[in-house]
Amino acid sequence: TNAPQVANPLADQTVDGSAATMAAEAAPTAEPTPEPTSTAAPVDIRVYVDYLSTEAREFQSANATQLSKWVGDDAATLTYYPVAMLTSKSNGTKYSLRAAGAAACVATHASDRFFAFNHELLTTQPAVDTDGYSDQQLADMAQGAGVSDVATVRSCIEDETYTAWAKAATDRAI
């Protein structure tokens, strides 16, 4: 597929530089003919998210409805990559890392509730330089997001089963 070209009116200007010469050289041509974009396959959308990042919260607030619609319409696939870039910004509690681990717990044990849990983490996000939520509060949020196997998810979150994975995922991302 050829992208349309934009003519530079000064590129091949004649020595006299007359307006007529420049206009003739800058006239667009009919080629190439644009072709419609194929819509056969869904668009693959990848979102890297730190649950303490205000930018991640703003992205979620601005785009969650549209992303959900595209996924529901099979127009897009959506993959979230929880990362913990702001681990040191929570008074030593490592909230960013623990929240990313909690998201991995929900993705592993209740994948059908991940989008709701992800949304809850971002829309009720604690402020930077605060303690953030405790592991028990994160588990309560997972339950509130509709996780059915509450005991397994709670144990996963409170035992911080996926924090090492979240740290490694963050290292890979950066």
Where are these regions (language model features)?
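Cysteine-centric redox/oxidoreductase cores and disulfide-bonded domains
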Residues: 86-174
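Extracytoplasmic thiol/disulfide redox context detector
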Residues: 1-91, 170
